[in-house]
């Protein structure tokens, strides 16, 4: 079987959580199924070191999507042509958008429906496109894959899609995240924060991630505790949020904030050496970033909304993302209570054992097979 996938969102050297998880998921699926051919399609050169096996062909082609017209060319002309050229049996649309101009069986990945809840950073033309076309994409798909029950329920309720059409593939923290020993932690802290303890956020720097409220919470923490602790924001700056860098430059505690784009290797080490991971996002379709932190054996503070509680269970402290004082209170609670911190780490180990990237890849592969309607073929 030939499986084509749109991987435009993956492969950057800059770590941003979801796309890194998706890249690794596709990588494992291809490696575990050497008898099938994979065609990974991207609109830009792949920056990440390619670890794909010989059964993977990476196709780099334009146009890069910068506006609605180029998006239409990509999905309605370029993608159908490539699917015909490579005689694809299944097409994986990895970002919730697909071509409506092909008969190729479709596995549609819907990570979230954030455009319905947090539309302000989205250009009006793109927002109009998503609101108008998403129902068509969902109806067209042979199988829909999400990474949480939360998103599945949203799809069913808001777009009247049958539950039977939707498969929930649980997320998993990447195996590259692991607990550091004390010497490694001290080495990382010395390198990045002058030996000081720090809270960390990893992921794309984007309005949806609620980092302004995180800065406000850190201000409250600094005022109340009079501590020398730092805040690390590790991730690439979204092009829609360039003014955030200026906010950090004028921030009262700017000398205690480290904002940096980083590779996944750096994110692993920075996360493992942190005192706690803070993820106060307004909306999330999956908890992969939280699971990365849990795998690193550090405690988690995250939002009570969307999919976070579904994923982290009792292994996290939960906050109202709209209330920076609530975020600050949880930071101070961990700062003061070492036994609570240790308890969350131990609970995290139990949660981490429930998620496995190999198992996630197997479930995803079964979803791909469901999208392929040809009768009488053994695709195991």
What are the residue ranges of the model-derived segments?
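Carbohydrate transferase catalytic cores enriched for Leloir-type hexosyltransferases
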Residues: 1-380
């Amino acid at each position: 079987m030939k499986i084509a996938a749109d991987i435009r969102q993956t492969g950057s050297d800059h770590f941003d959580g979801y796309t890194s998880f998706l890249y690794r998921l596709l990588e494992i699926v291809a490696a575990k199924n050497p008898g099938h051919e994979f065609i990974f399609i991207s609109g830009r050169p792949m920056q990440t070191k390619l670890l794909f096996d010989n059964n993977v062909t990476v196709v780099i082609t334009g146009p890069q999507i910068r506006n609605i017209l180029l998006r239409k060319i990509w999905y309605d002309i370029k993608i159908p042509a490539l699917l015909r050229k490579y005689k694809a049996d299944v097409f994986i649309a990895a970002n919730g958008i697909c071509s409506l101009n092909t008969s190729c069986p479709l596995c549609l990945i819907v990570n979230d429906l954030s455009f319905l809840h947090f539309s302000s950073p989205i250009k009006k033309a793109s927002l109009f496109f998503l609101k108008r076309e998403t129902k068509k994409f969902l109806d067209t798909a042979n199988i829909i894959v999400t990474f949480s029950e939360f998103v599945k329920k949203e799809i069913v309720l808001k777009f009247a899609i049958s539950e039977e059409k939707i498969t929930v593939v649980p997320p998993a923290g990447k195996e590259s995240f692991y607990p550091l020993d004390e010497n490694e932690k001290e080495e990382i802290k010395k390198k990045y924060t002058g030996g000081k303890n720090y809270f960390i956020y990893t992921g794309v720097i984007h309005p949806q991630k609620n980092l302004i409220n995180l800065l406000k919470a850190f201000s409250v923490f600094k005022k109340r505790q009079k501590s020398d602790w730092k805040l690390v924001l590790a991730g690439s700056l979204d092009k829609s949020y360039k003014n955030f860098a200026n906010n950090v430059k004028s921030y009262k505690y700017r000398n205690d904030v480290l904002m940096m784009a980083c590779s996944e290797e750096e994110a692993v080490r920075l996360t493992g050496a942190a005192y706690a991971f803070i993820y106060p996002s307004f909306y999330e379709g999956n908890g992969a970033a939280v699971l990365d932190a849990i795998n690193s054996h550090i405690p988690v503070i995250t939002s009570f909304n969307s999919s976070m509680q579904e994923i982290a269970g009792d292994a996290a402290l939960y906050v109202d993302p709209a209330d920076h004082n609530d975020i600050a209170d949880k930071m101070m609670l961990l700062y003061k209570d070492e036994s609570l911190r240790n308890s969350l780490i131990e609970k995290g180990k139990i949660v981490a054992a429930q998620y496995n990237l190999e198992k996630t890849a197997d479930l995803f592969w079964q979803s791909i097979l469901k999208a392929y309607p040809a009768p009488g073929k053994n695709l195991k």
